[in-house]
Amino acid sequence: MRTLVGVLAGLACLTAFAGPAPAGEPATMSQTIVNVEYEGSKIWVPGTIVVKKGTKVTLKLINNVPSDPNQHGFAIPGYNVAAIVNRGEPQTVEFTADKAGIFPIICQLHPAHVGGELVVLE
C-alpha cells in the first residue's frame, strides 16, 4: 500500500510540474478514415473528427467498399480540402485546423452525400 501511495505521489508531482508543449510547435493529429458500406449506404468512418484549433491534421483516406468499383470523394469545403479515393489507392490530405467551428465532410462527387463533420474546438 505504501508503494502505491508513493507511486501516486510521484506521479502527482510530475503532473504538477510538467509544462505545456514547447511554444511554436503545433499539435498534430493523424487518423485513418475508411469508406465502408453500411445498410446500402457508403459512409466514411469515423464520421466525426474532433481537433483543437491550431492542430496540424493528417488524414489517410481508404476506400474499402469491395462491391463498388467507383471513386469516392472526401471534401471539407470550409478548409478547401478535397480528395478522390479509388479502391485500393489510399490518399492523404493535410491541413491546419485554423478556424473553430463545425465543418461538413461531403462527397464532392455526389453532393447530396454528407459524410460527417470536422469539429474544431477553440
PLM regions: where:
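Bacterial N-terminal signal peptides
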Residues: 6-16
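Sec/Tat signal peptide C-region and signal peptidase I cleavage site
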Residues: 17-23
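Extracellular/periplasmic metallocenter environments
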Residues: 24-28, 85-122
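N-terminal edge beta-strand
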Residues: 25-56
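A mature extracytoplasmic/lumenal domain signature
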Residues: 35, 55, 61-65, 76-80, ...
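Beta-strand-rich interaction surfaces with strong enrichment in secreted/lumenal proteins
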Residues: 46-49, 80-84, 93-94
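Residues that flank catalytic or metal-binding motifs in active/ligand-binding sites
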Residues: 47, 55, 70, 89, ...
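Histidine- and aromatic-enriched segments that form or immediately flank copper-ligand environments
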Residues: 64-89, 117
